[in-house]
Amino acid sequence: HLCDRRQRQMCIRDSDAFRVGEDGPTHEPVEQEAQIRLMEKLKNHHGQNSLLVLRPADAEETTVCWKLAMENTDTPSALILSRQNIEMLPEGNDYGQAAKGAYIVAGSDENPDVILVASGSEVSTLVAGAALLRADGMKVRIVSCPSEGLFRSQCPCYQEEILPAGAKIFGLTAGLPVNLQGLVGANGKVFGLESFGFSAPYKVLDEKLGFTAQNVYNQVKEML
């Protein structure tokens, strides 16, 4: 009802993905990002996305997303946040571009061999994986996409600039792969989680479930 009636409300979800189950697998919302993002694709009676969904990559991007949510008076907003420590994005990152829903974190001046895209804490994993790929001679672009809904509201030329049609795009998500399938395109691939999580420290889970720089490297090499 809130989404249909354009009522302003903010929902903050502070335990995303599978990394919060160290004291038992009782609250790992692997599936919930996909459920929330479905509401972003549903229009209200005024033709707007019925919900603004934002999953920021680090503390600075969270500041931008918080401002977007506070300024959104037309629809409810949902912020999907992480509880574990997250590496900051590379120095010099233009965080203001997050207001467009998706933007280039690194590799903007090159014709990339592959584009890496994620939201939330997975972006920092892509940064680490990109370092391995670049050491292997590859040209890599990294895209942070806190809000697909905002990104799809940008002009087609901007969308093409960030994620060109026909590009090789690899997506990493700690939720269901469907979270990024609309971004990677026909030539892309998504590595995600298709089951509920486990009870263990988050760094152990990252390693066991493949959310590491090395697996980003392996997955991209396999895709190409």
Which role does the model predict for each range below?
Residues 57:
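TRNA-recognition modules of translation machinery and tRNA-sensing kinases, especially anticodon-binding
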Residues 1-12:
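Single conserved hydrophobic/aromatic residue that forms the stacking wall/gate
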Residues 17-38, 42-52, 62, 70-224:
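Thiamine diphosphate
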